[in-house]
């Protein structure tokens, strides 16, 4: 019922729905549609132009109507939304048969919002058309107006004034200084809308990022003070603002972001306050080569983990990973020779990629970001048993060690990779058990991190944030464990858990301190 209400509402979002396995006499959807998931994004036509496409079977030419209409954005993975028709032609011409154009001008891209319904409650994955420019109320009133410039990944701005923070639509990933100018343009539209101006500007702590440079230019142009907020702290603050919290513990798992120590953070346990944070735990770091191929080859990431441990892969393992011995030797040489120019990363998403390869369900190449996460989620959702009912031979594979380093806890997954290197090729029907066992281990790791933080903090409220906690299997498992141990858990609902929500947390911190 809630999904139906959302689909028919004026907001007209895309709603994430689970595929039905049994459709009776109805024609099933082709497996080519979203093959990496058991879900589909479904929406009704939100405009007259799209409704005409749905209704075209009534045209005089007698062309057959659609059984279903599959759409996707014009922006390639990692690219910002595009408005210029000539640029759209250039982007899509190589793999497009025909273009259907219109002469309506678009001031700013504001695509459909994306929602999911879980346990009867709506969660916003992409806050855009229909929700923007509605504000996020919080427990308090901002003593000053704030303009927040978000981050480069899933860029968005927010304008905080009075008792609410108004985040913009997601703009996409910024790849140049010129592309970042749209942040100032969108902020100025919010200023016109509210008839108010910011008293200060806030941006990401990485001052070399395009969004931070644009924020600095805007602040200088208008003679405004500029402050910074670390990205993972802002993740936590966004969820805290939504629930009216001033301080809490936070688990933030995502694809990585700038850390104050010069490393890439991405699997963090923080004590979060409006005026700062303490970092208590993270996953063990690894060297990440700054090459596109390293992100596209899950098998390579798995083998690099073994290289770090000092374990040579067997011939059987290389065959299972579909990697030639000579190719592995080249990867090993490049990895060892290039580590002094690498980024040291704690990002949780790379753990997903490597584990997906170790289980044997990863593709040879990841053609889009977070692909392994979706594949693991697909198989884990198919698992018919609870985490407690998973046979021990599966659960024991995903082992981790916890070590303490000067009031800082490290979750080391080395034993997981050693175990996965020794398994026999799993059967297809075992993949759900492997995936669900991995999720159970991640939840256990989250509990271990929060338990360590509780040695130094009296906080019992825990917020879950970051892209990986958009995965309901992980968020549910983690919330259940933490609740059983006496914590009160808060999750995103009105705000996205990914980087597009960071601007809200930035505005909350800067405006209230």
Positions of predicted regions on the chain:
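Conserved phosphate/anionic-ligand binding catalytic regions in large, soluble enzymes, centered on
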Residues: 48, 68-80, 254-264, 338-360, ...
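Short glycine-aspartate micro-motif
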Residues: 145-148, 202, 248-252, 463
